[in-house]
Structures are given as C-alpha cells and as structure tokens.
C-alpha cells in the first residue's frame, strides 16, 4: 500500500491536471471574495465566512473530474496490469486510490480556504452580526465538510475505477453538474410551504416600533403573516415523495454539500440536517460507495 | 487535402458526438421557439400589439450555444486522431501537417455552420409559418446572419487550436474550462463597466418599496422614524468604478473575445463602443491569429 501511494504521489506533482483543479478551486474562492467585497462596497451585510464552507460545492465537480483523468491513466497506459503483476491486491489498489483522492481533496480545500480566509479577510472582512455566520458556525461546520469531502472522494474513485473508457472525465463532469442541479431542484421542492395565506390583497402595515412591514387584508381585516388564515398548498409534495427527497438530499454528497454551504448563509435550505446527522450520512455514503466499488472492482474484467 | 476532408466528413457523419451536439442544438432551438410563442401571446394580449418584429432579436441567439457545442464537439471528435494514432497514417501517406490542421479546422467550421443552419432554419420557418403577426425586416435579419459568420470562424479556430496542440485525452475538460472562462469573463467585465461613478451611502436608512394607485412600485427611504427622499442621502466616489484606461481594456476584451461577442450577438448585453463591423473585424482577426499560431505550433509539435 505504501508503494502504491508513493507511486501515486510521484505522479501527482508532475500531473498538470492536479494544478488545473487547484486553480479552479482558487478561482471559485476568488469569486466569493470578490462578491463579498462588492456587497460590502454597497453597504450590504456580507462576510467571507458566507463562502468558507462553500468549498465543498466546487470540490464536488473538480475532484471527480480530476480522479477520472488521473486514475484513468492506469487503464489507458496499462499500468494497472503492472500493479497487479507485482502482487498488489485489487483491494489495496482501490484503497490507495481512495486515500490519494481524499488527500487531493484536502489540498484543494486548503487552496480554497487560503484564498477565502487569507485574502478574503484582508480584502473584504468577516463582520459578525445576527444574520452572518460566526466563527463558531465555521468551526462546527468544518469537520462535517471534511466528512462530505471524503464522500465526494469515495464517489470519484467509484466512478473512475469502474468506467474504463477514456471519456470518463466528461462523464464525471456531467454527473457532478447533474447531481448539483438535482440538489438545488430538490431544495426548491422541499421549500414549498405546506400552507398558504388566504387574503384579498397584500398591504403595508406599521408595526409597534413604527417600522413598515408586509401584511394581508381579508374581508376588511388586516392580518400579519403569522395571524392570517391559511389553507393547504396544492403544490406541496405528498408525504412518501417528501421523505424520499429528504433522504436523497441527505445521502447524496452533492446534497450534503448544498446543505452545508447553504447553512452557512442562514436558514435558506429547506432541510438543514443537524451537523452530526449530516456527517453520519456522509460517512454512510462513503462506506456504501467504497463497499460497492470494492465489490465490483474485484470482479471486473480488466482485460 | 480533398482526401483528408473526405475522410474527416465521413467520420463526422458517423460520429455520435456530432449528432448528440446537433440534438442539443435542436433542443435549444425548440425551447427558443416555445419562448417566442409565450412572448408573442403576452405581446398580443397584455401589450395589445398587433404586429412586431419577432425574428430579428432572436436570429443571433444561437451564438451562446454554438460556443458550448464547439467546446464539446472539437475535443471529442478531433482528439481521436491522437488517441487512435490516425494522425501518423495521414502524415505517412504524404499529407503535410498544415494540410492535416486545416482539414480539421474546416471540418469543425462545417459542423458549426451546420448547427447554425439548423437553428436559423427551424427558427425562421417556425416564425414564417406559425407567426403571421411577424413584421419581417429582411435587411436586419441578413445583417445579423452575416455578423454571425466571423464569430463562427473565430470559435472554430480557437477550439481547433486548443485541441490540436493538447494531445492528452483530458483535453475535453480543458476545452470545457476554456468555454466556462469565455462565458464567465464578459459578465464580470460588463458588471464592472456598469458600475456608477458615485455610490449612495444609506447611513442607517432602510429601503422600502410601495405600490401606487396605477400599480407602479416606488422606492422610499426611512431613517430615524422619518421618511426621507433619495436626494437626502450622501453620495461618495465608487471605488469599483473603472477608470478610462481599464474601461478601454474591458471594452476591447468584450468585443474581441468570442464570449463577449456571443453575448452581444444574442443581445444579452449592450457594450458602449461595440458594433457589428468592429466585432466582425475582430472575429476575422482572431480566427487568422488562432489558425496561424496553431499551424506554427503544430508543425513543431512532437507527435510521438
């Protein structure tokens, strides 16, 4: 196993794709810093900490693509046969790949965080107010994000090892994008409220402190959004589907990444699972993906 | 050269990637037509317009998807020359590297033109047969179609350059990254160009929106329990406002690079100082530069 890892690392530093992936992570981090700087310029509440845990989202695309390009070289150049011929077991090869891809994921995360925190704190800042994430939120979220990164690494190795065709990087890219869009779409569905207010017109009311707030008028009576009579929302999804979608959002690494990064900007996510639960799902996914990958890889005809 | 083109085209018709990208283009065209129908219904019922020019604003809308299609097709189609080793066969039978490069460029150019033809044919026929309210402006439509040609030349040249010089099977990923960069950069640059010279400081004021009797929304400001107007707010120079030298650079890049041209051709952004003839000239220039550089580099490349 040590020889396999040593061979991987020797190839890693010389691989252009590794540096391209790191640049992509740095680019995404810079977008977050620039966006924060822009919002602060206009006096809007913003913080670079909004984007700190966001790193898992570009990682969920960059890491599978990198793994696909890097590990596919074993099939393309036939080096996998050399590894097996020298007595390495398929399990050892697969696990060495998983360790490598997870470590690459950590390096990519560090690249992202160095721009986000290193450059971001000096160029933009991290104001601490009620609606912005605190350092405590970030410290709690970081271990969870590492578990999610492990899940992403497991998915990447599963795809890269089971698909031998040279177009696997494209498959990895499309799968990453598809699952990320699916996570956004599921979140939108889960956000549909179960009840809707019944009213004749929306009005502007003045509350006790003299501030204008949104209200509803029905049959001549003014209500606040909380007091207004409500009816069931016909667009809301029924129970078996709702539970299924919630499970899918929690089990998929892209769904976990979405919840993690959305959690850091407040309760925008429909179903933010508590950090411990999210981490457990991430580790569960890792176990299932790795177990499946090992089972199939051991029986696979490697020609 | 004729043999090379004939071999390339016979491979193109049998290539699944060519048909898949074509299917994507068709799907986008049909979506565009459905959006047109929705817009037409809205214009006729809500705005009570009797006739309007629906065709001219939509003729250039294929530019964005063409950029994406070329970014996907070029590497998937051309890279197999390296992967299957057919490039060696072409050189062994006496073809020059320049001929191989140009044949590949012309094949990708033909694919791009076919995709554009598909889009324009479906769009214009749909309007012609199913939108009797359309006011045809043949001159404007022709000018837009002619303006698309240098753009197509430059996009095909740029992606052929990339794919011919990168032998690795991961060139598809690089190509898609380039396409994402070409599409992301113009929006960033345009947003910066739109930044005002001065910005308003709220100074503790809150912003609210009210709707008057005619249904028009109006913004008003509230500070210390009092309603104030926009003139009462302080203005300071905007640090994100671009100074003239940088403005000129950003405007140049928006007009020169295919990404910015794609957005302008599809009327998504309106760049000050951008015009059809200028973009056409830049498109021709970029295609010549990319092809020239590609030919030079390809001749020196170690093909192993």
Where do the model's predicted regions map?
Chain B
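Short hydrophobic "helix-edge" motifs at membrane interfaces and signal-peptide entry regions
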Residues: 5-6, 83-85, 157-159, 276-277
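Secretory targeting signals
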Residues: 16-77, 102-176, 182-184, 188-199, ...
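A short amphipathic helical element positioned immediately N-terminal to and/or at the very start
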Residues: 1-13, 265-266
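Helix-loop interface residues and adjacent transmembrane-helix termini in multi-pass membrane transporters
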Residues: 81, 94, 165-166, 300
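Junction motif at the cytosolic side of a transmembrane helix
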Residues: 282-304
């Amino acid at each position: 196993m040590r020889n396999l890892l040593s061979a991987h690392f020797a190839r890693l530093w010389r691989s252009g794709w590794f540096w391209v992936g790191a640049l992509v992570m740095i680019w995404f981090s810079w977008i977050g810093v620039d966006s924060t700087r822009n919002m602060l310029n206009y006096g809007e509440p913003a913080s670079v900490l909004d984007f700190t845990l966001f790193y898992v989202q570009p990682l969920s695309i960059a890491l599978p693509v990198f793994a696909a390009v890097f590990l596919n070289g074993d099939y393309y150049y036939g080096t996998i046969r050399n590894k097996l011929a020298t007595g390495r077991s398929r399990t050892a090869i697969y696990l060495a790949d998983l360790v490598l891809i997870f470590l690459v994921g950590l390096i990519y995360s560090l690249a992202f965080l160095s721009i986000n925190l290193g450059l971001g704190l000096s160029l933009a800042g991290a104001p601490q107010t009620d609606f912005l994430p605190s350092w405590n939120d970030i410290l709690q979220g970081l271990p969870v994000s590492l578990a999610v990164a492990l899940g992403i690494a497991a998915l990447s190795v599963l795809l890269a090892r089971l698909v031998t065709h040279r177009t696997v990087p494209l498959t990895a890219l499309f799968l990453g994008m598809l699952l990320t869009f699916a996570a956004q779409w599921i979140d939108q569905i889960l956000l549909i409220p179960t009840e809707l207010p019944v009213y004749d017109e929306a009005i502007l009311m003045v509350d006790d402190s003299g501030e204008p707030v949104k209200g509803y008028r029905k049959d001549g009576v003014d209500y606040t959004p909380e007091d207004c009579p409500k009816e069931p929302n016909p667009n809301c999804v029924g129970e078996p589907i709702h539970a299924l979608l919630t499970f899918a959002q929690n089990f998929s690494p892209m769904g976990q990444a979405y919840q993690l990064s959305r959690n850091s900007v407040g309760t925008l996510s429909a179903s933010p699972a508590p950090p411990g639960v999210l981490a457990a799902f991430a580790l569960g996914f890792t176990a299932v993906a790795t177990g499946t990958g090992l089972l199939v890889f051991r029986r696979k005809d490697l020609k | 050269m004729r043999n090379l083109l004939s071999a390339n085209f016979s491979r193109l018709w049998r290539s699944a990637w060519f048909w898949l990208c074509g299917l994507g283009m068709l799907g986008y065209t049909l979506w565009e037509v459905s959006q047109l129908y929705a817009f037409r219904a809205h214009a006729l019922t809500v705005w009570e317009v009797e006739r309007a020019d629906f065709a001219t604003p939509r003729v250039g809308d294929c530019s964005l998807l063409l950029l994406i299609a070329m970014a996907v097709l070029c590497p998937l189609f051309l890279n197999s020359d390296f992967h299957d080793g057919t490039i060696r066969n072409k050189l062994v039978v006496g073809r020059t590297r320049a001929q191989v490069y140009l044949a590949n460029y012309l094949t990708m150019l033909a694919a791009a033109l076919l995709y554009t033809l598909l889009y324009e044919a479906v769009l214009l026929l749909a309007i012609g047969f199913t939108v009797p309210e359309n006011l045809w402006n043949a001159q404007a439509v022709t000018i837009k179609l002619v303006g698309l040609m240098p753009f197509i030349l430059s996009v095909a040249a740029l992606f052929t350059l990339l794919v011919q010089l990168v032998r690795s099977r991961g060139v598809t990923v690089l190509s898609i990254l380039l396409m994402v960069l070409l599409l992301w950069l113009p929006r960033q640059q345009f947003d910066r160009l739109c930044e005002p010279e001065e910005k308003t400081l709220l100074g503790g004021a809150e912003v609210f929106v009210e709707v008057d009797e005619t249904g028009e929304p109006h913004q008003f400001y509230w500070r210390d329990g009092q309603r104030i107007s926009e003139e009462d707010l302080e203005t300071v120079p905007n640090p994100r406002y671009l100074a003239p030298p940088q403005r000129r650079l950003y405007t140049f890049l928006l007009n020169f690079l295919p990404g910015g041209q794609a957005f302008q051709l599809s009327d998504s952004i309106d760049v000050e100082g951008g015009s059809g003839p200028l973009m056409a000239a830049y498109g021709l220039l970029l295609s010549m530069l990319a092809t020239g550089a590609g030919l030079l580099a390809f001749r020196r490349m170690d093909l192993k």
